[in-house]
């Protein structure tokens, strides 16, 4: 059986239960030997007084158990220089990783997506199909109900309950401590 490396780009500010289930969907897939998460550094703010940083994201992913999973390789998106200054683009990093590593890995490579982002898969496949062992994973993660990182940030900033935004094995207080 050919094994698959799944590449997942995103901001994840903050990572919510939908992200958790999305990552676990690929981690628990027996055909997947590696899940590579590329995370952008741009903060997401609520007003002037509350922001979610990449450090918050990493602490939450660790709390969820994602970063400690042996299948997961996590990396911050590379800082790039553009006409408007420095920026990160985790989606560009996924393309760069596939270009740089497709001939070095025995694994097939796939883009990890939720059901709301399937258009990206077509572009990824089209770009790489002529020279790399890129596959489409037919079992794109289907979200049973949409959870919003924006609403999660707003609830955190307002001090409201965040139970609906986090996995069942995590306590609200653990997340709140990260932002204290």
Question: What does each model-found stretch correspond to?
Answer:
Residues 1-180:
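Nucleotidyltransferase catalytic core that binds NTPs
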């Amino acid at each position: 059986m050919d094994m698959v490396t799944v590449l997942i780009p995103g901001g994840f500010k903050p990572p919510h239960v939908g992200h958790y289930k999305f990552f676990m969907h690929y981690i628990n897939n027996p055909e997947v030997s590696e899940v590579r998460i590329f995370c952008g550094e741009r903060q997401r703010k609520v007003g002037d007084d509350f922001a979610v940083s990449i450090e918050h994201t990493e602490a939450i992913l660790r709390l969820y158990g994602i970063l400690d999973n042996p299948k997961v390789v996590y990396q911050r998106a590379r800082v790039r220089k553009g006409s408007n200054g420095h920026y990160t683009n985790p989606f560009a990093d996924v393309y760069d990783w596939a270009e740089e590593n497709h001939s070095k890995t025995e694994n097939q490579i796939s883009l990890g997506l939720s059901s709301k982002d399937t258009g990206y898969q077509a572009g990824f496949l089209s770009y790489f199909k002529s020279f790399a062992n890129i596959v489409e994973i037919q079992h794109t993660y289907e979200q049973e109900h949409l959870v919003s990182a924006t609403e999660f940030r707003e609830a955190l900033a307002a001090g409201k309950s965040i139970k609906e935004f986090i996995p069942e094995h995590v306590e609200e207080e653990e997340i709140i401590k990260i932002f204290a």
